[in-house]
């Protein structure tokens, strides 16, 4: 209420809309873990109460699912909300609960792109490895059925039918979403100590994060005439 909102969910919606406005205006958004799907869920649910009573002291809209407007979303569509407050999940965008992979077999592969025809995906997938060890998060990976057709999948686990690393233009800007929390801590729990980055100088997953940090600086320089 100190910020002029009646509910926390209304404040979070305002933040999601401001982030979308930034991208539409030409900004670049890089997000990981639950920062990926939670934005789109908030945007699709504008004006709809999707929060269980335990969160905001009033019941959620019984028609919440059918009132979602996927046209407002950046990356996802046709997803179903998780309405049970006792299940650690927002929707079926995240594939954490449906994937049947052991840690020893949990990998994803990067697609190859042409630097001539696809310069941005080429920059974002630069790596010394094309097969990369996966990792968990509150949002681990993305159900392919929930991804909008215009969104480019740059990394996937084909066997599990899930995307790990996606990118798209939006308005005048771009966004890249990367599923999972900490690439070098397979299951990172709340309260766990931070990973010592010095122990992983050649991490292919950290390289993908670095690609996104450096991407905004990769602007074409003006040529002398």
Go through the PLM ranges and name each one.
Residues 49, 144-225:
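Extracellular ligand-binding/catalytic regions of CAZymes and related secreted enzymes
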Residues 32-152:
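An acidic, glycine-rich "communication" segment
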Residues 1-38, 172, 212:
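Short alpha-beta junction capping motif
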Residues 3, 7, 20, 27-31, ...:
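Conserved aromatic-histidine-acidic binding/catalytic patches
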Residues 17-19, 55, 141, 163-166:
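Generic recognition of flexible, low-complexity loop/linker segments
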Residues 3, 23-24, 63, 190-196:
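Flexible glycine/proline-enriched surface loops and loop-helix/loop-strand junctions
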């Amino acid at each position: 209420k100190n910020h002029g909102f009646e509910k926390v969910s209304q404040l979070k919606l305002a933040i999601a809309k401001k982030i979308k406005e930034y991208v539409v205006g030409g900004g670049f958004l890089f997000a990981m873990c639950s920062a990926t799907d939670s934005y789109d869920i908030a945007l699709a649910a504008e004006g709809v109460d999707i929060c269980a009573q335990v969160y905001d002291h009033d019941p959620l809209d019984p028609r919440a699912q059918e009132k979602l407007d996927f046209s407002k979303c950046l990356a996802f569509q046709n997803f179903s909300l998780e309405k049970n407050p006792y299940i650690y999940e927002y929707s079926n965008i995240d594939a954490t609960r449906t994937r049947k992979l052991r840690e020893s077999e949990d990998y994803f592969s990067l697609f190859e792109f042409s630097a001539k025809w696809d310069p941005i995906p080429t920059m974002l997938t630069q790596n010394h490895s094309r097969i990369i060890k996966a990792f968990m998060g509150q949002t681990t990976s993305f159900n392919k059925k929930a991804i909008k057709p215009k969104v480019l999948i740059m990394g996937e686990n084909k066997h599990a039918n899930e995307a790990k690393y996606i990118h798209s233009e939006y308005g005048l800007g771009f966004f890249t979403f990367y599923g999972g929390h900490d690439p070098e801590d397979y299951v990172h729990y709340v309260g766990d100590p931070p990973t010592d980055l010095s122990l992983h100088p050649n991490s292919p997953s950290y390289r993908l994060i670095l690609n996104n940090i450096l991407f905004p600086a990769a602007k074409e320089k003006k040529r002398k005439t």
